[in-house]
């Protein structure tokens, strides 16, 4: 199935406010509520919509530190290392990348002690050769809501 202009408009509205009801979306797009229901169901079935969530301000929840961590790992262990790291509650993103490092991790911490424990735990994972941690001084933009 293909995603058309109406699907993209629905997605744009949901990206802005995932609490919108089918009725509100239908009214904004001037289409039937049933159409909106069917389209959203189709987008879920296709895996385009993977859930509905809220956008949080992590600093207001006490997560003062954002770390970007480059990890050099043994090639045959990369996938296993990524899975182990992805399970940690501090981790928001794990990327398998090209370049100097094999893995890039974005994680949020409430304290330097939490970050220190995390980095040391990463270094103890079998196959991790080295890490390089950068702490964000200011978050200028942090928004994964791209226009569909």
From Swiss-Prot:
Cited InterPro entries: ArsR-like_HTH (IPR011991), AsnC-type_HTH_dom (IPR000485), Dimeric_a/b-barrel (IPR011008), Tscrpt_reg_AsnC-like (IPR019888), Tscrpt_reg_AsnC/Lrp_C (IPR019887), WH-like_DNA-bd_sf (IPR036388), WH_DNA-bd_sf (IPR036390)
Residue ranges occupied by any HTH asnC-type domain in the UniProt entry: 3-64
Molecular-function GO term, any one: sequence-specific DNA binding
GO biological process, one term: response to amino acid
Pfam families per record: AsnC_trans_reg (PF01037), HTH_24 (PF13412)
CDD domains given in the database record: HTH_ARSR
GO cellular component, one term: cytosol
Residues of the signal peptide: none
Keyword Transmembrane helix: no
Protein's UniProt name: Uncharacterized HTH-type transcriptional regulator PF1734
Keyword Transcription regulation: yes
DNA-binding region location: 22-41
Keywords from the UniProt entry: DNA-binding, Transcription, Transcription regulation
């Amino acid at each position: 199935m293909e995603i058309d202009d109406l699907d993209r408009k629905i997605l744009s509205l949901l990206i802005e406010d995932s609490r919108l009801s089918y009725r509100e979306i239908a009214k904004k797009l001037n289409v039937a509520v049933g159409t909106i229901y069917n389209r959203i169901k189709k987008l879920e079935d296709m895996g385009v919509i993977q859930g509905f969530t809220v956008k949080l301000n992590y600093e207001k929840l006490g997560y003062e530190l954002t770390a970007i961590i480059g990890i050099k790992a043994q090639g045959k262990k990369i996938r296993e290392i990524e899975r182990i790291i992805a399970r940690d509650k501090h981790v928001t993103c794990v990327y398998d990348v090209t370049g100097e490092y094999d893995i890039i991790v974005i994680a949020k911490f409430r304290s330097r002690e939490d970050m220190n424990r995390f980095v040391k735990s990463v270094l103890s994972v079998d196959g991790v050769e080295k890490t390089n941690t950068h702490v964000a001084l200011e978050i200028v933009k942090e928004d994964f809501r791209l226009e569909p």
